[in-house]
Curated annotation (Swiss-Prot):
InterPro entries: Dehydroquinate_synthase, DHQ_synth_AroB, DHQ_synth_fam, DHQS/DOIS_N, DHQS_C. The gene is aroB. Its main location: cytoplasm. This is 3-dehydroquinate synthase. Belongs to the sugar phosphate cyclases superfamily. Dehydroquinate synthase family.
Length: 362
């Protein structure tokens, strides 16, 4: 069932997000509709490939494509140059040329790495996103950010490279482990907290349905998240201005991931911590009320997500924050709450004060 199509309007690089439940077997037809030809390399991982590769392969072969698998180890810890080289090896071994393309079948790690491989292999071949986790469906598969991590920071190596299409099948969430599902809900909260107060109300009212993975509630939540992100990306594709709002919760969240070696927290869990801390900081500076801060924190808790920064010395936090991609000469760009559903961007030069407000003092 196709429930909706959302357009990401980027002139000649525009594309559709096709959303539904049980529509994964449409991938071959979709690739034909967007004009793709040649061999399709399906980049996936050892968790997702056993579940969905055959469905994708059969659909692609019915549409007349040659299909080759490139299967990687699973986990954020593998989002690095060594694993990226495994993708290149698979593409070279299969003799992919510039008339071929990549299907990114998996979560955010697969989408980011496969997208970066597509951007750089033979100086660029097309790719299609098939996100199978909630987090990747509402965030990383839309907008063209691709890349890998560096030992000193998250997503420090990458490129903006738009897919030809995105196919979202919320039925793939049925096989998603609970913790990863909750992690995706954390990223959804972001959109309501700083961009759409009505959507935040929806999340508060439908938290139980979302936790139960109700298909109708999920399609609404994923669709609204994608529509919000598509609008922001259309206004600011390369994060030169308003798109930075999508980093709400990510500044401290990325620091948490870096300090814990990408092993203790899932991305959405780290973002949830970052959002709560951003709301506390916003209340401290008078940008939002205590009631607004409490609503954000209560929704994060209701969705089973963490709220507190892990204990590390302030100097380690400062070091991690100093490598954030939003650092400029005038300080760290921090996304704050301006009530519920609105935001303001602040340049913070005193990282020590920021950490003290968040409970990490000397």
């Amino acid at each position: 069932m196709i429930a909706e199509k959302i357009r990401v309007a980027l002139d000649e690089r525009s594309y559709d997000i096709e959303m539904g439940a049980g529509n994964l077997d449409r991938i071959g037809s979709l690739c034909r509709e967007v004009g793709l030809s040649g061999t399709a390399a399906v980049v996936s991982n050892t968790t997702v490939a056993p579940l969905y590769y055959e469905t994708v392969r059969l659909s692609m072969e019915r549409a007349g494509y040659r299909v080759v698998p490139v299967t990687l180890p699973d986990g954020e810890g593998y989002k690095n140059s060594a694993t990226l080289n495994l993708i290149y090896d698979g593409l070279v071994d299969a003799s992919l040329d510039r008339g071929s393309f990549i299907l990114a079948l998996g979560g955010g790690v697969i989408g980011d790495m496969a997208g970066f491989a597509a951007a750089s292999y033979l100086r660029g071949i097309p790719f299609v996103q098939i996100p199978t986790t909630l987090l990747s469906q509402v965030d990383s598969s839309v907008g063209g950010k691709t890349g890998i991590n560096h030992p000193r920071g998250k997503n420090l190596i990458g490129a903006f490279y738009q897919p030809k299409a995105v196919l979202i099948d919320v039925a793939t969430l049925d096989t998603l482990p609970k913790r990863e599902f909750l992690s995706g809900l954390g990223e959804i909260v972001k959109y309501g907290a700083v961009l759409d107060g009505g959507f935040f109300d929806f999340l508060e009212k439908n938290a139980k349905l979302l936790l139960a993975r109700d298909k109708e509630a999920l399609i609404q939540a994923v669709s609204r998240s994608c529509a919000i992100k598509a609008k922001v990306v259309a206004e600011d594709e390369r994060e030169g201005g308003v798109r930075a709002v999508l980093n709400y919760g990510h500044t401290l969240g990325h620091a948490v991931e870096t300090l814990t070696g990408y092993t203790r927290y899932l991305h959405g869990e780290a973002v949830a911590i970052g959002m709560v801390q951003a709301a506390r900081l916003s209340q401290h500076y008078g940008f939002c009320s205590q009631a607004d801060r409490e609503r954000i924190e209560a929704l994060v808790v209701a969705l089973g997500l963490p709220t507190e920064l892990p204990s590390f010395p302030p100097q380690q936090y400062r070091e991690a924050l100093s490598h954030d991609k939003k650092v400029r000469d005038k300080g760290l760009l921090f996304i704050c709450n301006q009530g519920i559903g609105a935001y303001r961007m602040e340049r913070l030069t005193d990282l020590g004060a920021l950490l003290e407000i968040c409970g990490i003092g000397e």
